[in-house]
């Protein structure tokens, strides 16, 4: 079984000079899910991992360089996630490769990523536009003392069963760390839900308690979804984290209660 420590993360690697789908490094989702009591065969959520790729280039049949940007969507039901540095190296391996057309390139990327993830992956050229302010109500202006930065503390979460609301809460203060390199991962996270009103101060303390936590982006979002669901008992819940760019890629994991329609990729955060 592949582990993060087996990947190219934290290692000096030479950039590929020719196309090589073998650079893609899959990591099973099951291990991290088991740690928080999730079973791949009975997931409590639907969702996807949406990537924005900013550094995509190849050669046309005459050798002229071409450039593009792309949006990639990996279903959360795939047995494997795609490690980000390997994804970057894979895209770099296309830089000196002659390809008949943009559509031929897209089809090749779809096939390679689907094989890596173990499920059909969607790839489209183009990116959503920027939005200066996130959709929802920010909780970052709350005045409170915080002294816990990890590990994540679900005990901070609570909700008022006597007041049922439907709202979207947003924080730009989510930070976690790569489990291999220790590099910081920054994100704006939004929680849209209907149910007992979530205590905002407790939610902010909970999100800040990820600050020294080491876990991949996708795993953090699944942990947030699971712990908010368990502690606050919403009727339904959506959690999305929009991470800042690294190596020409940003990732946006989204998890939601079954039956919730996937959001359209209509915008990117200003920090992306």
Curated annotation (Swiss-Prot):
The residues responsible for catalysis, as annotated, are 178, 185
> Domain of life, per the record?
Bacteria
One GO BP annotation here? tRNA modification
This entry's Enzyme Commission designation comes to 1.7.1.13
Name one matching Pfam family: QueF_N
Q: Which is a Gene Ontology cellular component entry for this protein?
A: cytoplasm
* Primary enzyme class: oxidoreductase
Q: Where in the cell is it found?
A: Cytoplasm
Catalytic activity from the UniProt record: 7-aminomethyl-7-carbaguanine + 2 NADP(+) = 7-cyano-7-deazaguanine + 2 NADPH + 3 H(+)
Please give the Gene Ontology molecular function terms for this protein. Answer: preQ1 synthase activity
Which residues of the sequence carry a binding annotation for substrate?
82-84, 217-218
Which pathway does this polypeptide act in?
A: tRNA modification; tRNA-queuosine biosynthesis
Which keywords does the record carry?
A: Cytoplasm, NADP, Oxidoreductase, Queuosine biosynthesis
Residues given in the record as NADPH binding sites: 84-85, 246-247
Instruction: List the InterPro entries.
Output: GTP-CH-I_C/QueF (IPR043133), NADPH_dep_7-cyano-7-deazaG_red (IPR050084), QueF (IPR029500), QueF_N (IPR029139), QueF_type2 (IPR016428)
Cited function: Catalyzes the NADPH-dependent reduction of 7-cyano-7-deazaguanine (preQ0) to 7-aminomethyl-7-deazaguanine (preQ1).
Its assembly, as annotated, is: Homodimer.
Entry's family note: Belongs to the GTP cyclohydrolase I family. QueF type 2 subfamily.
Q: What is this protein called?
A: NADPH-dependent 7-cyano-7-deazaguanine reductase
Lineage of producing organism: Bacteria, Pseudomonadati, Pseudomonadota, Gammaproteobacteria, Lysobacterales
């Amino acid at each position: 079984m592949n582990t993060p420590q087996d990947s190219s993360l934290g290692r000096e690697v030479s950039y590929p000079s020719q196309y090589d789908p073998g650079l893609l490094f899959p990591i099973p989702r099951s291990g991290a899910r088991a740690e928080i009591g999730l079973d791949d065969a009975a997931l409590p959520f639907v969702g996807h991992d949406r990537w924005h790729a900013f550094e995509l280039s190849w050669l046309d049949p005459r050798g002229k360089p071409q450039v593009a940007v792309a949006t990639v969507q990996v279903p959360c039901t795939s047995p494997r996630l795609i490690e980000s540095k390997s994804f970057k190296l894979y895209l770099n391996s296309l830089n000196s490769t002659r390809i008949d057309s943009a559509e031929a390139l897209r089809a090749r990327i779809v096939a390679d990523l689907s094989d890596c993830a173990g499920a059909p992956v969607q790839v489209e050229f183009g990116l959503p536009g920027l939005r200066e302010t996130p959709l929802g109500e920010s909780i970052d202006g709350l005045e409170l003392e915080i002294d816990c930065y990890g590990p994540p503390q679900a005990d901070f979460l609570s909700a008022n069963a006597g007041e049922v609301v439907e709202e979207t809460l947003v924080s730009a203060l989510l930070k976690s760390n790569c489990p291999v390199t220790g590099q910081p991962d920054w994100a704006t996270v939004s929680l849209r839900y209907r149910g007992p009103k979530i205590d905002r101060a407790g939610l902010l303390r909970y999100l800040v308690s990820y600050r020294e936590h080491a876990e991949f982006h996708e795993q953090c979002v699944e942990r947030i979804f699971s712990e908010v669901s368990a502690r606050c008992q919403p009727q339904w819940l959506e959690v999305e984290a929009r991470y800042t760019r690294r190596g020409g890629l940003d990732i946006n994991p989204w998890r939601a209660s079954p039956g919730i329609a996937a959001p359209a990729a209509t915008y990117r955060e200003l920090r992306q």
